[in-house]
Amino acid sequence: EGTSFKEPSSEDLDHTFLWRCMKKLPERGRIGIFNRSYYEEVLIVRVHPNLLEAQRIPNVHPEDQTWHDRFDDINAFEKHLARNGTAIVKIFLHVSKEEQKNRFLDRINRPDKHWKFAGADIKERQYFDDYTQAYEEMIAATSTEYAPWYVVPADKKWVSRTAVATLLAGTIDQLGLTWPAVSEKQEQEIESARKKLEAE
């Protein structure tokens, strides 16, 4: 199941920054895909520290320690998930500034892609270098043995899609999954059904 996280709601802001993602975690045996996540809280909020005020956190200031504390919280949360059997795959699709510009122009110049355009994207583009610095520090601080980051070059979509598909297939393969076991009674029913169908 895929979940896209948008701007936090007032209910989200009444909880810790991890809460809304915790609610969307897949149950055991399922795959969950997060488009954005609690990592926004060490990216967008770091680039725009005024957003911390809306979170009503006592005694917090947009200084380096706030972000390091959040990195620690994220690492502890992901370690908890990994210890409980969740395979975590974190993918950063790295798009260059030039390619980002080309994609925005494509959305602007093609009416069939206007639905993808958001003025906020152009506004945020002026912070490209700030985001790059925040991404680099985030990846360095939160790439762990139990929840590593994979930085995938994404200027060419076919390259990124192939890399991501290969990565996910490899991760699933490493889980050593098997078909569900069937009882002796089910085996007998299967054999009986096969004989019946073959006799038709």
Where are the language model's segments positioned?
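Flexible, compositionally biased loop and terminal segments
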Residues: 1-200
